[in-house]
Amino acid sequence: MNIAKAKPRVFFQGREINFDVVIPRIAATWTFYGAAVVRQFELMGSLSANSSASISRSRDKLRALQLIGNIGVEMPITGYVHLSRDIESVLNTVGEPPFVIKLLEGTQGRGVVLTETMGAAISAIETMKKIDANILIQEFISEANGEDIRAIVVGDEVVASMKRIAKPGEFRSNVHLGGRVEDYKLTDQEKESAIKSAKVLGLSVAGVDLIQSDRGPLVLEVNSSPGLEGIERASGIDVADKIIEYLEKEHLTRDKSKPIDI
């Protein structure tokens, strides 16, 4: 990138590049750099499927849950612990074991541990804190039976959805961990929760993960670069085509005088 007065530029292999529309596909470990590149394209006038600011918001899982919870969307009871001395008190605010312990930097189900007792939870968190990890503590939703739901939001609608089912003996349903997928039709409440969650983060394209509970659907997290292979296979819907159709319309109708969300 070349950051200069009134003339931002992007280069690839020594050649200057520019696009009308960009579709960010950014690995979690590349968030800072990826968001910076998207921001540069936005300053050059490109339309991004998701703004650099919305990508940064969604990748900060704690911030995302704070924003989602603030608009009244249901989610698992969640605690955040910073100091080791506060571990037990935070666990008590979440409830009774078992607890789900999550690394904020984890992806695809990695960095997620189920602890069956208070002692096991404390030990797991203390171990993670030794490497200065940021940790979320969530209630375990036993009635979900190792299943969750992925909804793809594009614009103001859900264009595809699927159910993910964990392999035997595993509580995480991620496909990368051996889970299987099947087509699933969302309820109106699930659709509303998914769309609201994407919108409050400023995302136009998002994968929203939900879990079914005795008190209704709960939002687990929102992904700004959702994988498409599994959901396209399960639903039979060409999600990539839906995204391109949406962006073509947005490109033709957008107001370029509107302030950029950076």
PLM segments and residue spans:
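Glycine/Thr-rich phosphate-binding loops of Rossmann-like dinucleotide-binding domains
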Residues: 32, 109, 216
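Protein kinase-like catalytic core scaffold
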Residues: 99, 159-160, 206, 218-220
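Active-site nucleotide/adenylate-binding loops and adjacent lid/helix of ATP-dependent enzymes
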Residues: 9-11, 15-17, 42-45, 49, ...
